């Protein structure tokens, strides 16, 4: 319930631009957000392991 209400709260237009913040499109997490993909690091890792993000593969050196 709390996460749902935070998602709704974040969707409203803020009075000032600096108050807006980005959230993961999948889980709604506000921290560790990757702008390029629009998701958080945890969701990114899961999708990358499943091969659902084109051009991303596990690095090894």
UniProtKB/Swiss-Prot annotation:
HAMAP family the record matches: Ribosomal_uS14_2_B
UniProt xrefs under PROSITE patterns: RIBOSOMAL_S14
Signal peptide residue numbers: none
Annotated NCBIfam families: PRK08061.1 (NF005974)
Designated name of the protein: Small ribosomal subunit protein uS14
Entry's Gene Ontology molecular function annotations: rRNA binding; structural constituent of ribosome; zinc ion binding
Cofactors named for this entry: Zn(2+)
Protein family: Belongs to the universal ribosomal protein uS14 family. Zinc-binding uS14 subfamily.
GO annotation terms (biological process): translation
Keywords for the protein's UniProt record, in alphabetical order: Metal-binding, Ribonucleoprotein, Ribosomal protein, RNA-binding, rRNA-binding, Zinc
Cofactor binding, note field: Binds 1 zinc ion per subunit.
Role: Binds 16S rRNA, required for the assembly of 30S particles and may also be responsible for determining the conformation of the 16S rRNA at the A site.
Any Pfam family matching the protein: Ribosomal_S14
Organism encoding this protein: Alkaliphilus oremlandii (strain OhILAs) (Clostridium oremlandii (strain OhILAs))
Summary of subunit composition and partner proteins: Part of the 30S ribosomal subunit. Contacts proteins S3 and S10.
Binding of Zn(2+), residues: 24, 27, 40, 43
GO CC list: cytoplasm; small ribosomal subunit
């Amino acid at each position: 319930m709390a996460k749902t209400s935070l998602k709704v709260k974040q969707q409203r237009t803020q009075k000032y631009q600096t108050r807006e913040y980005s959230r993961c499109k999948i889980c709604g997490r506000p921290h560790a957000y990757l702008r390029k993909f629009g998701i958080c690091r945890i969701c990114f890792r899961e999708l990358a392991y499943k091969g659902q993000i084109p051009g991303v593969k596990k690095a090894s050196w």
